[in-house]
């Protein structure tokens, strides 16, 4: 067959396949045009999942009469100047949207320019103009109707999913666009039924309150983030670790006001929540980035759902720092049963832990599970696995209010639990509060009793707080181990036989050389030996027996993917969590009131104390009004 030049109509249909692959793609192109036109209100109507009808109306600046036909010419746009791809600030810029839609459907557009006296109308079918410009009826902005989608490309029509599935795609897309463009009012109507209507808002959090997927519950169980570094600003709202979901899909990412999908950003979110939520649960995150246009490429794919960052490491670090700062500053995460929580957690077999890590446990470590919890000495009795036993606590915040007159004393047996619960211990706590002995009530209140030798019951104002003693102490031990690691470094073990490893290329050698000091700080000594060979002489002692070659391979993979040595950090964090689980107070341990209160005070000053190392909540709060509802009291 001889080579022939395809007709413009065929070329447009082929190109349309990349831009318009489903009804949601049509909605995306038209709504993005409305946003770029400065619309304050955008209304979308859909019928039959978008196959029969998609109409988008806005009150934007409109299109001048003499430019309406030009708008349907391929790569004709008012949003980009030749050679200015490095400074894209609009949602659209390729000039393909209207051309692609008109190539595969019947399109009618009515528009009234802000400076014009009247509106004008034009129609296209299958890429061909079917009616010249005629006067139209419209008070302002632009109205576009798309009918019989893919009538000109029957093959594409056969591959559409069910009406319900296509409709859900449209709902999800519009919600993402409405989420980040919170200053614009949005509405979606299917035939005669209004699916949602969002008012223009002044802030992102107010828009999230309107949305069914988030609402007031998320806003109460979320943290605001706002962090800048160089040319990158990270902002948004992230759910508390205890507010998690069983299915993924609630991490929404945006770059310069554009909904995007990025494995880099998803990886940073996953790393930030590592150890704070269970492995089978997923966080709820609304993450937005403002990046200077010169440092991000949005011209990756016609769908504009992917972007490339010039400096991946900087972006990854900015997101990780923003989320990490917010999550760590929220020392004791508030939690109530209204939040979606995880169910169950990983149980660690005792014999397995002892077999794997036993040689790193000192006598003090093994005795930690029965240690006395006193405010002055709690941290010093937590097992030390790295370096010497001295830790500088000059910056610590030991709470000394539970001494002398401020201590709730127990009976002579030193235990308050369900088998011997007495009204005297409860009334004692109340009398202390009534007498005004405490200048300020601590956030987690004061212990009242121990329940089932597993839970601590405390009262703080109108709240009853139930604390899982093992989960809470597990987090305290883990954070203490991290503190020791940061102050004294990680204890290393010298390999009897240094392991020589041949790298794949010079780039890998450069990366290991660049990260050599950081890896040293993490207990891994790697030295170049010439050519493409490195030698591993020392590894973190807590790793035990380790495959050095596999370890180096994983480290290189982590550095190349995320620009950080997070694989080593993650492995250390996992082991520290396992050790903390083994070393913490077990369920069934009877505790004195002063021990319970000591645990509460340390929870208030310890990062991430709202969750154990497996992501389970360490406590729940029940408000008096919630308890009243259980008894149908008004």
UniProtKB/Swiss-Prot annotation:
This is DNA mismatch repair protein MutL. The gene is mutL. SMART domains: DNA_mis_repair, MutL_C. Residues 406-427 are annotated as: Disordered. This protein is involved in the repair of mismatches in DNA. It is required for dam-dependent methyl-directed DNA mismatch repair. May act as a 'molecular matchmaker', a protein that promotes the formation of a stable complex between two or more DNA-binding proteins in an ATP-dependent manner without itself being part of a final effector complex. Pfam families: DNA_mis_repair, HATPase_c_3, MutL_C. Gene3D superfamilies: 3.30.230.10, Histidine kinase-like ATPase, C-terminal domain, MutL, C-terminal domain, dimerisation subdomain, MutL, C-terminal domain, regulatory subdomain. The keyword DNA damage applies. GO terms for cellular component: mismatch repair complex. InterPro entries: DNA_mismatch_repair_CS (IPR014762), DNA_mismatch_repair_MutL (IPR020667), DNA_mismatch_S5_2-like (IPR013507), HATPase_C_sf (IPR036890), MutL/Mlh/PMS (IPR002099), MutL/Mlh/Pms-like (IPR038973), MutL_C (IPR014790), MutL_C_dimsub (IPR042120). One of its GO terms (biological process) is mismatch repair. Keywords: DNA damage, DNA repair. GO terms for molecular function: ATP binding; ATP hydrolysis activity; ATP-dependent DNA damage sensor activity; mismatched DNA binding. Belongs to the DNA mismatch repair MutL/HexB family.
């Amino acid at each position: 067959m001889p080579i022939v030049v395809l007709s413009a109509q065929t070329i447009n249909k082929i190109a349309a396949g990349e831009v318009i692959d489903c009804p949601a793609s049509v909605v995306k192109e038209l709504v993005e045009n409305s946003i770029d036109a400065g619309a304050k209100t955008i209304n979308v109507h859909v019928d039959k999942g978008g196959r029969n009808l998609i109409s988008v109306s806005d009150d934007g600046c409109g299109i001048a009469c003499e430019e309406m036909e030009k708008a349907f010419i391929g790569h004709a746009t008012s949003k980009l100047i030749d050679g200015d791809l490095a400074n894209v600030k609009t949602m659209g810029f390729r000039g393909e949207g209207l051309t692609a839609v008109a190539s595969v459907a019947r399109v009618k557009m009515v528009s009234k320019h802000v400076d014009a006296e009247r509106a004008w109308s034009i129609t296209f079918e299958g890429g061909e103009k079917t009616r010249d410009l005629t006067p139209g009826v419209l008070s302002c902005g632009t109205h576009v109707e798309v009918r019989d989608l893919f009538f000109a490309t029957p093959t594409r029509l056969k591959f559409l999913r069910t009406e319900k599935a296509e409709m859900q795609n449209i709902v999800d897309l519009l919600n993402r666009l409405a989420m980040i463009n919170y200053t614009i009012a949005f509405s979606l109507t299917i035939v005669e039924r209004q699916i949602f209507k969002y008012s223009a808002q002044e802030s992102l959090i107010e828009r999230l309150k309107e949305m069914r997927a988030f609402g007031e519950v998320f806003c109460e169980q979320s943290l605001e983030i706002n962090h800048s570094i160089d040319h990158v600003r990270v902002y948004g709202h992230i759910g508390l670790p205890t507010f998690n979901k069983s299915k993924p899909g609630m991490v929404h990412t945006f770059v310069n006001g554009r909904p995007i999908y990025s494995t880099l950003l998803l990886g940073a979110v996953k790393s930030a929540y590592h150890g704070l939520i269970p492995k089978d649960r997923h966080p709820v995150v609304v993450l937005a980035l403002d990046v200077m246009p010169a440092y991000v490429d949005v011209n990756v794919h016609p769908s504009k759902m992917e972007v490339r960052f010039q400096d991946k490491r900087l972006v990854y670090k900015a997101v990780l720092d923003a989320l990490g700062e917010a999550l760590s500053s929220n020392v004791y995460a508030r939690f109530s049963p209204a939040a979606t929580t995880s169910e169950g957690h990983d149980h660690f077999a005792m014999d397995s832990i002892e077999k794997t890590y036993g040689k790193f446990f000192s006598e003090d470590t093994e005795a930690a599970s029965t240690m006395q919890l006193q405010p002055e000495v709690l941290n010093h009795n937590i097992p030390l696995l790295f370096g010497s036993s001295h830790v500088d606590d000059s910056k610590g915040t030991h709470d000394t209010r539970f001494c002398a007159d401020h201590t709730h004393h127990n009976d002579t047996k030193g235990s308050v639990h369900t088998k011997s619960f007495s009204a005297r211990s409860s009334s004692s706590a109340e009398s202390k509060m009534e007498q005004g002995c405490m200048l300020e009530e601590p956030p987690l209140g004061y212990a009242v009793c121990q329940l089932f030798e597993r839970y601590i019951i405390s009262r703080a104002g109108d709240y009853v707080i139930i604390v899982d003693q093992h989960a809470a102490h597990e987090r305290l031990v883990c954070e203490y181990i991290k503190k020791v690691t940061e102050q004294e470094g990680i204890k290393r073990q010298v390999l009897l036989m240094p392991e020589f490893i041949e790298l794949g290329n010079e780039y890998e050698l450069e990366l290991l050389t660049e990260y050599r000091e950081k890896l040293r700080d993490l207990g891994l000594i790697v030295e170049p030996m010439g050519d493409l060979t490195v030698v591993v002489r020392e590894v973190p002692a807590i790793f035990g027996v380790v495959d050095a070659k596999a370890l180096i391979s994983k480290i290189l993979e982590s550095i190349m993917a995320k620009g950080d040595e997070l694989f080593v950090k993650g492995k250390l964090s996992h082991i520290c969590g396992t050790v903390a689980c083994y070393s913490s107070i077990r369920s069934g341990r009877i505790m004195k009131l002063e021990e319970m209160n000591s645990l509460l005070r340390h929870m208030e000053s310890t990062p991430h104390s709202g969750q154990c190392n497996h992501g389970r909540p360490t406590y729940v709060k029940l408000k008096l009004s919630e308890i009243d509802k259980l008894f149908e009291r008004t």
